[in-house]
Amino acid sequence: MAHRQEIVDFAMQFEGNPYVYGGTSLTNGADCSGFMMSAFKEFGYELPRVAAAQYESSQKKEISDIEVGDLVFYGSNIYHVGLYIGDEKIIHASTSASGIKVSDYDFETPSGVGTYLK
C-alpha cells in the first residue's frame, strides 16, 4: 500500500486542473469526491463515489490526530471532501471557478476526518 506522502505528491500534480461536477478525470475535471476516488485508485484503493459514502466507509479519526493523506470532510450531510497535505492545508476540487486547489483545511469547519491509510 502507498505511503501517505506518495498519495499527496500524486494529487498535488493536478492542482489547477478543472472542477467538473460529477467528473472523475484527474486531467479533464473532477468534483471533490471524484478527485479523491481517482487519486486513491492510482494506489489500489477503492473509495466510494460520493463524499458522504467516503466518510462512512473510512476509519474515523479525531481532527487532533490528522495526518498527511487523511481525508477531511465538510457539511452536516457530508457534501465536500479534501485531502490533507500537511501544514493545515488540503488539496480539493473546490468550485468550477477555482478548480483543483490548495486551501486551509479549516476554510470551512470540518465535520470529520477519515482515513483509508495505515
Which residues does each PLM region occupy?
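Aromatic- and glycine-rich peptidoglycan recognition patches
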Residues: 2-10, 45-63, 85-118
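Catalytic cysteine-centered active-site loop
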Residues: 13-68, 115
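Catalytic nucleophile-His microenvironment captured as a short glycine-rich beta-strand/loop
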Residues: 71, 79-89
